[in-house]
Amino acid sequence: MKNQEIHLPTPNPEHPYGGGNGRYRFPDINGMNLLGDNISLPPIVPKSFHIMLTVFHPETLYGMKKWLPFCEDLRKQYKHTPTPVEYSILLVLQPPPIEGDVPAFTQALGDFPDFYMKTNSLISYYDQSFVRRRLSLHKKAETAIVLLDGNGNIIWKDDGGFTVSRAEHLKVILETLSPLAPRTRTH
């Protein structure tokens, strides 16, 4: 991975979702976390990064769970740096709500004893095609992993489940963008 080039999206000031600064912005989505609190994503936390594990069907949550240990390691590594890394799981379901959606979501994620995950897992009923368009995803995409800056702008994204190469690519991007990033050893 070290010899590969890092490809970040080129800002486009004419992009309709750019907000004038040329960056693609993650859509503002409201929903409920696993504690029953209404929250909005993406969080706006300047000088930080946020990984959005975005899922469009409860069945695909099982595959996205493989990202959780990797994201938790990144969160711990960057916790005491000037550019902390946080993460969330976002389940975007097509409205109207169907009875059993929330239990299916919690069952798919497992019984989280972890307050962080209960707080940062969001279920939302939103137009899936709109979210896919905003993320420039294929119209049938089931998942996306999206790296955001502290203002909710998209830095990098990929669609699909966890692979070592995707994880390494994300790690290299974070190390490149965060000048005081913790350096990790690769075995």
Model-derived features: positions:
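Thioredoxin-like thiol-disulfide oxidoreductase module
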Residues: 9, 96-141, 173
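A short beta-strand-turn-helix
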Residues: 29-50
